[in-house]
Amino acid sequence: MSTPSVHCLKPSPLHLPSGIPGSPGRQRRHTLPANEFRCLTPEDAAGVFEIEREAFISVSGNCPLNLDEVQHFLTLCPELSLGWFVEGRLVAFIIGSLWDEERLTQESLALHRPRGHSAHLHALAVHRSFRQQGKGSVLLWRYLHHVGAQPAVRRAVLMCEDALVPFYQRFGFHPAGPCAIVVGSLTFTEMHCSLRGHAALRRNSDR
């Protein structure tokens, strides 16, 4: 897939709905921007995996993606990723791929289907030093804004543990029932978000 213009995604003004922390402040004047949002590249894979491993293994004992899978998705579909960098340091990320079926399956964990219309969010993680600051919320809102602007993408899908269902509902996701994917003893709820509905939510937040 040709992606000549997505590797340097620039921050854009974004109105957040009530209850979600505000977007980062203005960039300070020095060499590295105080806050930068951009699509990730394979060169970012090691930093991504370091954050992911600490965030997920400490909670569930499993990583959604191993290092090879991170590199795989950042090579095939970098436009479906988004990283938040503070003074050049990666502090939070989302990695996704396209999926072409109504529901997630075991295959969806490792595949990118270029003709799909669903952005499958594989992982969202925040560096431990930057948690409890609302960064996950800001990044997810920006990500949905970003992928929703891509003509091929009609919805976002993910799987999460039951405790996280209310968090994702704040962004327009709705439970689609138990996910067919099981990881060890862990079970998940599958969540769907129409990006057309998300655009309407953005418009309402501007009022």
From Swiss-Prot:
Changing C160S: Reduces catalytic activity. The keyword Membrane does not apply. Its EC number is 2.3.1.87. Highest expression in the pineal gland, followed by retina. Expressed at much lower levels in brainstem and pituitary gland. AANAT activity also detected at low levels in the olfactory lobe. Residues 35-196 form the N-acetyltransferase domain. The modification Phosphothreonine is found at T31. CDD domains: NAT_SF (cd04301). Signal peptide: none annotated. GO terms for cellular component: perinuclear region of cytoplasm. Changing H120Q: Decreases affinity for acetyl-coenzyme A and for substrate. SUPFAM superfamilies: Acyl-CoA N-acyltransferases (Nat). The record marks H120, H122 as: Important for the catalytic mechanism. It is found in: Cytoplasm. It catalyses: a 2-arylethylamine + acetyl-CoA = an N-acetyl-2-arylethylamine + CoA + H(+). Pathway: Aromatic compound metabolism; melatonin biosynthesis; melatonin from serotonin: step 1/2. Its main location: cytoplasm. cAMP-dependent phosphorylation on both N-terminal Thr-31 and C-terminal Ser-205 regulates AANAT activity by promoting interaction with 14-3-3 proteins. The keyword Cell division does not apply. Controls the night/day rhythm of melatonin production in the pineal gland. Catalyzes the N-acetylation of serotonin into N-acetylserotonin, the penultimate step in the synthesis of melatonin. Monomer. Interacts with several 14-3-3 proteins, including YWHAB, YWHAE, YWHAG and YWHAZ, preferentially when phosphorylated at Thr-31. Phosphorylation on Ser-205 also allows binding to YWHAZ, but with a 10-fold lower affinity. The interaction with YWHAZ considerably increases affinity for arylalkylamines and acetyl-CoA and protects the enzyme from dephosphorylation and proteasomal degradation. It may also prevent thiol-dependent inactivation. The physiological stoichiometry of the interaction is not clear. In vitro studies show either 1:2 (i.e. 1 AANAT molecule per YWHAZ dimer) or 2:2. Belongs to the acetyltransferase family. AANAT subfamily. This is Serotonin N-acetyltransferase. It comes from Ovis aries (Sheep). The lineage of its organism: Eukaryota, Metazoa, Chordata, Craniata, Vertebrata.
